[in-house]
A protein has these predicted regions:
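Structured alpha/beta reader/binder surfaces that contact nucleic acids or chromatin modification marks
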Residues: 2-183
């Protein structure tokens, strides 16, 4: 992808620590963020994935982005069912549904940066970036970014899932679906 993205797109730079996480994103279309370390706003337009040192020759760069389709709160146990003994198995995570991974050509190298946490940027900065440092929103544009983030935080993001049919359920069926016992 030649970095053609709307200049006003809101982008969350997210940390991808393991190749397995990249494969989950590519094959299953989701990315996980621990609730206790999550940024305040998850309802963004895109995720840009910063690859850590565990990626070998592809380390310390942003090589992929993906459009955000929605998000939900769940547990690590639900997300990674093959890890029932993990120390954080019962902790809450955001499961961010994403579209297909789009490769950035060329990728955006970290430059001098190595340790990165979540941060926000815009499509305009992504298009022009030569290094990760170039993604940092400058003071003159920071107010625009914070206003966009506040707007996303103040109202729930809609992800364009289209019209959903209304379904009428009997009280017993609804109670069963919600796990509510009869009184």
């Amino acid at each position: 992808m030649g970095r053609i993205i709307s200049p006003d797109a809101l982008i969350l730079v997210a940390v991808m620590t393991q190749l397995r996480d990249l494969e989950i994103a590519r094959l299953f279309g989701w990315y996980r963020i621990p609730l206790k370390t999550a940024p305040k706003v998850i309802a963004v337009d895109y995720l840009a994935f910063y690859q850590t040192g565990s990626f070998g020759a592809d380390k310390w760069r942003i090589q992929y982005i993906a459009q955000v389709k929605g998000h939900e709160l769940t547990t690590r146990a639900e997300l990674l069912q093959d890890q029932p003994d993990h120390p954080r198995v019962n902790e809450e995570y955001y499961k961010v549904q994403i579209g297909s991974l789009q490769e950035l050509l060329p990728p955006i190298p970290a430059g001098k940066w190595r340790r990165i946490t979540f941060f926000y940027t815009t499509g305009e900065y992504l298009q022009d970036a030569e290094t990760v440092n170039d993604l940092i929103v400058h003071s003159e544009d920071r107010q625009i970014l914070w206003t966009a983030l506040r707007e996303r935080l103040d109202k729930e993001q809609t992800y364009g899932i289209g019209d959903q049919p209304e379904v009428e359920l009997e009280d017993e069926v609804l109670a069963a679906l919600l796990g509510i016992q009869g009184q």
